[in-house]
Swiss-Prot record:
Transaldolase is important for the balance of metabolites in the pentose-phosphate pathway. GO terms for cellular component: cytoplasm. It catalyses: D-sedoheptulose 7-phosphate + D-glyceraldehyde 3-phosphate = D-erythrose 4-phosphate + beta-D-fructose 6-phosphate. Keywords: Cytoplasm, Pentose shunt, Schiff base, Transferase. This is Probable transaldolase.
């Protein structure tokens, strides 16, 4: 499973990229709004740092508007992926983008049927939301398993991005259930590195080494 970072913050992206584990970035209008910078300018900055997929979301609700926005976003850099909501209008736009060779990430996926429809429309990625399903008492892990099974049975190449990740367990389970990618907030990404026994082990090794010098 690959790691994307879910942020529009440049410092977080730079720090994650330096770790050598980052395969891409996902953004959304809420994340970009927090940064208080022009959307296109921030995307140019991100794509200058990260060579992998950078998801940029359209805000139009009709297919024509999404296509117009998406085509402009795609001009920013070759690694821009157009993020489109899981709606009928969204999938109309996905079909057009697919025919033009523009990569897409269909977001706000909450059922396997939605994922299958998005894949058949030509989506490069689908993004089921784990945390938001948890919030309403549904099992997001089972959803990822089901989507992965369906895609495997039918030979579908669309990749599954586990999104709305809130804690390290979400990452582990997403990997076990067949997600190709986890898009993770910076805070959660940093938590993945930590375990008390790792810290204790390093301290002991250093103490032993210093004693014998």
């Amino acid at each position: 499973m690959k790691f994307f970072i879910d942020t529009a913050n440049l410092e977080e992206i730079k720090k994650a990229n330096e770790l050598g584990i980052l395969a891409g970035v996902t953004t959304n209008p809420s994340l970009v709004a927090k940064e208080n910078v022009p959307f296109h300018d921030r995307l140019r900055e991100i794509t200058s740092i990260v060579s992998g997929s950078v998801s940029a979301e359209v805000i139009s609700t009709d297919a024509e508007g999404m296509i117009e926005e998406g085509e402009e976003l795609a001009k920013i850099a070759p690694n821009i992926t157009i993020k489109v909501p899981m709606t009928k209008e969204g999938l109309k736009a996905v079909k057009v983008f697919s025919e033009k060779g523009i990569k897409t990430n269909v977001t706000l996926i909450f059922t396997a049927n939605q994922a299958l429809l998005a894949a058949r429309a030509g989506a490069t990625y689908v993004s089921p939301f784990l945390g938001r399903l948890d919030d309403i008492g549904h099992n997001g892990f089972e959803l990822i398993s089901t989507i992965a099974d369906i895609f495997n049975i039918h030979g579908i190449d669309t990749e599954i991005i586990a999104a709305s990740i809130r804690h390290p367990l979400h990452v582990t389970e997403a990997a076990l259930r067949g997600a190709h990618i986890a898009t993770v907030p910076y805070k959660v990404l940093m938590q993945l590195f930590n375990h008390p026994l790792t810290d204790q082990g390093i301290e002991k090794f250093l103490a032993d080494w210093n004693r014998q010098k």
